[in-house]
């Protein structure tokens, strides 16, 4: 009885320790980047709006380029790779959540046609596994396995993200067909400027909320500033600026409403593009091969017949 109670106590102690350790890791340590795909997953059922706009652009305001490479056509039930390219200058540093400077992270959302999904680990070729590395692919939701998100991951290592994709088999999945399908992709580098609740992150420009004169600037101990602006009617408005953005105003300066108080710290941005892929019918390829073979055979017989005819003509002329 005593031994059983001792085992239970040890298990409880172990569980409590793991819980506290996880809490410390998740909450206590400063984050180098916000987990931006989570924001979209929590707020939107589908990341692509009816207009074609990918919702990541709601938080990542700057526009940057992104590219995708996919095969022109694939056979059913085969594994192929889609490569998403998110280029940027790796020397750039962004403002982190704690106000310090650090490297940029990248993230991507890949919107595949219905039926296409991330390939199981046992179906991925070894050569492709070496390109993937330690990437983790997450379905956008349990209902949308054809929509995949990756990130945030270090941009210095992953300016190209390889997705191992398994194509569907229309013979088994009646919801898919041999057809040309669009593939949509969104990719960003760096943190966002807006949170889902509409508030600004510290990776954004801060503007004056009113017209007036800056009568005092106070630096906060942990970074950031408090600006007191005196309005024309004598009221004092307090502007709070978090750690990270750099001030471009000074005490005694007059400002107008919506005038920038800080530089724009953002060096990243979001981009989206699309590609096309054909789910090819093997029977069509076999028919095409058979057609080419028949043409070659017909051409061969035609040449042989022509030579035979020429020999007959030559024999008649000699006779």
From Swiss-Prot:
UniProt cofactor note: Binds 1 heme group covalently.
Descriptive protein name: Cytochrome f
Leader sequence segment: 1-35
One GO cellular component term noted in the UniProt record for this chain: chloroplast thylakoid membrane
Transmembrane annotation, as ranges: 285-305
Keywords annotated in UniProt: Chloroplast, Electron transport, Heme, Iron, Membrane, Metal-binding, Photosynthesis, Plastid, Signal, Thylakoid, Transmembrane, Transmembrane helix, Transport
Any one GO MF annotation of this record: heme binding
Disulfide partners: none
Cofactor(s) annotated in UniProt: heme
The keyword Transport is annotated on this UniProt entry: yes
Function text: Component of the cytochrome b6-f complex, which mediates electron transfer between photosystem II (PSII) and photosystem I (PSI), cyclic electron flow around PSI, and state transitions.
Subcellular location: Plastid, Chloroplast thylakoid membrane
An individual GO BP term: photosynthesis
Chain positions recorded as heme binding sites: 36, 56, 59-60
Family: Belongs to the cytochrome f family.
Membrane topology of the entry: Single-pass membrane protein
Known partners and oligomeric status: The 4 large subunits of the cytochrome b6-f complex are cytochrome b6, subunit IV (17 kDa polypeptide, petD), cytochrome f and the Rieske protein, while the 4 small subunits are PetG, PetL, PetM and PetN. The complex functions as a dimer.
HAMAP family xref list: Cytb6_f_cytF (MF_00610)
Matches recorded under PANTHER family: CYTOCHROME F, PTHR33288
Gene: petA
KW Iron (keyword) present: yes
């Amino acid at each position: 009885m005593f031994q059983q109670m001792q085992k239970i106590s040890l298990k409880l102690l172990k569980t409590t320790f793991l819980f506290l350790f996880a809490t410390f890791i998740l909450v206590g340590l400063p984050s180098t980047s916000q987990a931006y795909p989570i924001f979209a997953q929590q707020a939107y059922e589908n990341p692509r709006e009816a207009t074609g706009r990918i919702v990541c652009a709601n938080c990542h305001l700057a526009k940057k380029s992104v590219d995708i490479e996919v095969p022109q056509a694939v056979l059913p039930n085969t594994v192929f790779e889609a490569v998403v390219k998110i280029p940027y200058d790796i020397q750039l540093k962004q403002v982190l959540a704690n106000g310090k400077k650090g490297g940029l992270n990248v993230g991507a959302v890949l919107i595949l046609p219905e039926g296409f999904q991330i390939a199981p680990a046992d179906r991925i070729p070894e050569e492709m596994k070496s390109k993937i590395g330690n990437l983790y692919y997450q379905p956008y939701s349990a209902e949308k396995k054809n929509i995949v998100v990756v990130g945030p991951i270090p941009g210095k290592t992953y300016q190209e993200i390889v997705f191992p994709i398994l194509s569907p088999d229309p013979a088994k999945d009646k919801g898919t067909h041999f057809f040309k399908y669009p593939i949509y992709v969104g990719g960003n580098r760096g943190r966002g400027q807006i949170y889902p609740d509409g508030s600004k992150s510290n990776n954004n420009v801060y503007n004056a909320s009113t017209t007036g004169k800056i009568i005092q600037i106070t630096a906060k101990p942990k970074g950031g500033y408090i600006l007191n602006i005196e309005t024309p009617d004598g009221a004092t408005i307090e502007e709070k600026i978090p750690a990270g953005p750099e001030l471009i105003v000074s005490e005694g300066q007059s400002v107008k409403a919506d005038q920038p108080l800080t530089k724009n710290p953002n060096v990243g941005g979001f981009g989206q593009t699309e590609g096309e892929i054909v789910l090819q019918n093997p029977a069509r390829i076999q028919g095409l091969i058979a057609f080419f073979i028949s043409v070659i055979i017909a051409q061969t017989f035609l040449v042989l017949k022509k030579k035979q005819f020429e020999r007959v003509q030559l024999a008649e002329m000699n006779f």
